[in-house]
Amino acid sequence: MSPPVYSDISRNINDLLNKDFYHATPAAFDVQTTTANGIKFSLKAKQPVKDGPLSTNVEAKLNDKQTGLGLTQGWSNTNNLQTKLEFANLTPGLKNELITSLTPGVAKSAVLNTTFTQPFFTARGAFDLCLKSPTFVGDLTMAHEGIVGGAEFGYDISAGSISRYAMALSYFAKDYSLGATLNNEQITTVDFFQNVNAFLQVGAKATMNCKLPNSNVNIEFATRYLPDASSQVKAKVSDSGIVTLAYKQLLRPGVTLGVGSSFDALKLSEPVHKLGWSLSFDA
C-alpha cells in the first residue's frame, strides 16, 4: 500500500478535530444525485454568517473509468466557474489534474497537479500558473513498517528561492497513531489518535510557535462516539475554553441531519456562542 500524500499524513487527527462540526455555518444544505450512466450532480448551499446571504454552488462530475479521464464543472452564485480535468492511468501510479477558477472581470487561477505513487513513496507537485510570480509546491512521503515521513516545500519560480518548507513524521500502529510536524515558521505540532474500540475514537493535538519567546502550547482534545449504526456524537475542547459539540443522524437512507454548537466556557454570559445545522440528501 502506498503512503499518503503529505497533507494526509495527519488525516486521522485532523478529521477528528475538524470534520462533522456544524457550528461554523448557521445553515447548510446539499443534494447529490447520480444518473444511471454515472454522472454525478450536486447542489450545495450554506449561510456563512447569521442573517447573511446564501453561498450556493452547482456541480456536475463525469468519470470514464476505462480511460481514467474525469471532468468536473461547477458554477456558483457569485458567477465563479470552477473546472477540474483529471487524467489518471496514463502510466501506473501517475495522476494529473488541471484545476481552473474564473470569475469574469475579477479573478482567475489555474493549478496543475501531478501525483505519482509507488508502494514505498508518494510524490506530488502543484504548479500555480496564473500568478504574476508562478509558484511550485512539491512534497514527498515515504513509509516503512508503520513509520511515515514526509517533507513539503514551496518554490517561487520568478525569485528562484524557496518560499516555505515543512516536515512531518508519524508512526501508525493497528489502533493508534503518533505524529509531529515542523515548518519554516517554527510552528510545531504533536498529535495522537486512537481507535479505543469500534465505537469510540479519541485524539489530541498540541501546537506551539517556537519563534515566540515564552510561547504557550495550544492544546485541543476531541472524541467521536457511535451510539449506533446511524448516528454519531462528537465533542472538542480547547485549552482556550472553547467547547464544541456535534450530532449527526441518518434519518433514512440518503438523508443525513447534522447539528452543532460552540460556546466559550469562560464567557458563558457573553454572546459569543454559535449554533448551526446541515441537511444532506444523496440519491
UniProtKB/Swiss-Prot annotation:
Binding site for ATP: R11, K19
Gene Ontology molecular function terms on file: ATP binding; phospholipid scramblase activity; porin activity; ubiquinone binding; voltage-gated monoatomic anion channel activity
Effect seen on changing K19E: 2.5-fold reduction in steepness of voltage dependence
Keyword Nucleotide-binding carried by entry: yes
In-chain residues carrying the UniProt-annotated modification Phosphoserine: S109
InterPro entries hit by this protein: Porin_dom_sf (IPR023614), Porin_Euk (IPR001925), Porin_Euk/Tom40 (IPR027246)
Keywords: ATP-binding, Ion transport, Lipid transport, Membrane, Mitochondrion, Mitochondrion outer membrane, Nucleotide-binding, Phosphoprotein, Porin, Transmembrane, Transmembrane beta strand, Transport
Effect of D51K: 2-fold increase in steepness of voltage dependence
Record remark on domains: Consists mainly of membrane-spanning sided beta-sheets. 19 strands distributed along the entire VDAC protein, have the potential to adopt transmembrane beta pleated sheet structures, which rolled together may form a 'beta-barrel' type structure, possessing pore dimensions.
Protein name, entry field: Non-selective voltage-gated ion channel 1
Lineage, opening ranks: Eukaryota, Fungi, Dikarya, Ascomycota, Saccharomycotina
Gene coding for it: POR1
